[in-house]
Amino acid sequence: MRRRTFITTSTAALMAAPAIAQSASQPEYTTTNAAWQAAYDKALSILVKNTQVMPRYSKPVLIEGSVYQGIWMECGPHEALVYRKFRPDVARNSHMCFFELQRADGQLPCNNKVTETGFGQIQMVVPIAATALELARATGDQELLETAYRGASMWDGWLLKYRNTRGTGLTEGFCTYDTGHDNSPRWQGIPPQCPNKDAKYYPEGFKLPRLCPDLSATTYGARKALSEMARALGKTSEADMWAERAATIRDLILKRLYVAEDAAFYDEDAGRQFIRIRSDILSRVCGEHVPDQALFDGLWTRQIHNPAAFWAPYPLPSIALDDPSFVRPITANTWGGPSQALTALRAPRWFGHYGRSAEFTVMMERWCEGLITDMTFRQQMNPLTAEFTRDGDEPDYSPAALVMMDYTWRLAGVVEEVDRLEWNIRPNHAASKGAQFRLPTDAKSTAEVRYSGRGADLTLGGKKLGRIEGLARLITDKSGAPTALLGVSEAPQKVTLRLTGRPARNVMIKANERISL
């Protein structure tokens, strides 16, 4: 019999909710803004279409869509996690398929496509250990927790054996597809795949292997997750071991692959030379929270929020705008410059962590603007014009559809995080025009936001939490108790709080300011 409820451990925070195999109800969003509603509804229809059964695994998973007929480890589990409120079974399957297809030596498949299960590259970005942990924690899925811990531990061992050939302790890249940076100048001249489709080997003559900051960051994020998993499973000594190993590789990334004078992370080739191209490596390293706040603040000023570099009109380009390697003109499926839907989908994993929720609002609005204007949901767009690449890139790409869905809720609805609910109140926004949001929570309650006039009414499980007028994010615990108000606009906002059981309160809140309640 499958056990789907966590055993009792000291990590009570992981025991938040019982498991659910199939969603009893799905999130609901309606608005009188016809254009926004049409884009949102089309995004959901694409995700339904892209929920398919692939060969060699018997249950439905969320595939990449467009020209990509399969599920990839670098992104598929994370995408399905974002989709979990609609299809928790698909979120689970999109993790378990990789563990079921894992080889006895620990190697995880890089993908499972219609044509084959791939082992020709490691292709990892968002750690499957991290997304599996989040899903297991949210749904109380003991079997997933145990399976993911075992599988991700074996994968770490495989990487240490076959992707640490230089003995540095950092994770090595052997080919272009290892990082999924197709057609990027970062990998110019390097074969796309490992010889004979075997990720244990690298081609000779290209100054390989490389020490890769982003692959190493993925390993770091996975080890942090493994530490939490071990603690939840009562394996205290193993939890400490994984935490120590995580700290070690983080330290190596910062000491060996960060160049302070450029405020950039670079690959180091086998000749110990940096590949000095400012690329999407940066967002991926931030995605696993490798930089501390002080280092991030420098990266933010010099690179990420610099309009000449990565803060394009439609962020974030895959190569800095002012980097001479930026590929022009833009071609299909290239990480040589365009803003990629995958990067946008991963952004919530780090913008808020580093205290940049207000600026993230701008990015979300720009992406939704581009998607609503285009309506074909393709892979990449010109960071200067929002024009989506058409020649060679097909429509109905799952990450683009997920961006539209996820950003709608993050802009003007309610979002459930690991330990809290975030109520994003944004009256007079295109997404909130006559809008209603209904979100089933992991505790089998329903969180609702209903807009009217200059604000919105908030309820949880039929109980009124209050009303907010003005633009801000109310943060509550899972039971709805208010804990903080966050400024999520770049301009100061006047906000009126009418919270149940408390006197009305007027506040002025600045960008990214956090007011305890």
Regions found by a protein language model. Name each.
Residues 71, 124-138, 261-303, 333-458:
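C-terminal capping/lid segments that line or modulate ligand- or cofactor-binding pockets
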Residues 69-76, 80-95, 99-189, 212-216, ...:
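Aromatic-rich carbohydrate-recognition surfaces in CAZymes
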Residues 20-69, 142-144, 153-160, 230-241, ...:
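Acidic/polar, glycine-enriched structural segments that form the non-catalytic walls/loops
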Residues 453-517:
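C-terminal beta-sandwich/jelly-roll accessory domains of carbohydrate-active enzymes
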Residues 5-23:
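N-terminal export signals
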Residues 42-49, 97, 151-165, 218, ...:
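Alpha-helical scaffold segments in carbohydrate-active enzymes
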Residues 30-70, 93-118, 165-210, 251-339, ...:
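Extended glycan-interaction surfaces of carbohydrate-active proteins
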Residues 28-37, 83-95, 135-153, 167, ...:
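Structural helix-adjacent loops and short alpha-helical linkers that scaffold large soluble proteins
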